[in-house]
Amino acid sequence: MKYYKFGETNIEIGSKYLDLYLEENNYEEDQNILINKLKENGFLLIKGLHDKQEISSIRKKIISILTKDDIFDSGKNEITGNLKEGIIKTSTVRGNEKIKIPELDILYSRNKFTSFFENLLGGEIISPEFKWLRTVGKGSSSKTHCDSVYMGRGTKKMLTCWTPIGDVSPQMGGLAICLNSHKKNEILKTYAKSDVDIDLIEGHFTDNPLEMVDKFGCKWATTHFKAGDVLIFSIFLMHASLTNTTNSLRISCDTRYQRKDDKRDNRWFGECPLMHYRFHDDNNIKEKLVDSRLRWGI
């Protein structure tokens, strides 16, 4: 039996809780088929939308920039990004704050990539200038949440695109999605309608990922992601990341896309976006998760 760590819980692959399988699609497939799959499943795993060598080059550059922090084992391959023994890198690096590399902007502006999203969304697209570039070290993970609570003031058709910067195994903290969670009305009418800057909730839905299976019947699924892959999903789809149990730094980048003529969440657009003006203010007291769940009645 094989187990992966999910938060503080070890979950058996192939159990009722977690599958090591996500349906794969090619970017050249019929767009109508992909659109219908996205609507039905809430996600698309697209193989080879980015150039593998370009992704590898970006990973090398990010690791090179972070080398000055003296966190890497210099004896390892430069693309591996192995952390020194005893160092736990748990911080999230924001692309707009610490690492600014033009290669990321070039990556996401390539015609192959933008054309795919324009076909998927049925019109000219726009993306927030802000990019969520993340480095995830040993012991780190993200909790169960959907993106609507963070960026739900604009169109409800906004899509998240998660790009692994390099190969990402489940052991490295790959993303896991909660199948069919975007169809759960009890969540859509309560938690998913929340706004972290208005309601000052904690952001995530549960501390226990197994609850999504036991209470809501939504199984988790992940896979071995390869450089060049992208995982596209609805802002209402519950997701999380497995815990990185390796010494390799997981690097990924989140970007968001919507039709240019759709309503925007202005917290995330412009050269100096407002972002989370209350949620990240330590002077504001957030509602405890247990109290939020009681208020929602779920």
Regions found by a protein language model. Name each.
Residues 1-24, 72-74, 187-193, 227-232, ...:
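Non-heme Fe(II)/2-oxoglutarate
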Residues 123-126, 148-153, 165-174, 180-182:
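Active-site region of the double-stranded beta-helix
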Residues 123, 136-139, 167-170, 183, ...:
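Short, charged/polar surface micro-motifs in flexible loops or helix N-caps
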Residues 152-170, 224, 232, 256-259:
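Short, conserved beta-strand element in jelly-roll/cupin
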Residues 170-237:
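Double-stranded beta-helix
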Residues 43, 156-162, 172, 220-222, ...:
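Extracellular structured ligand-interaction cores
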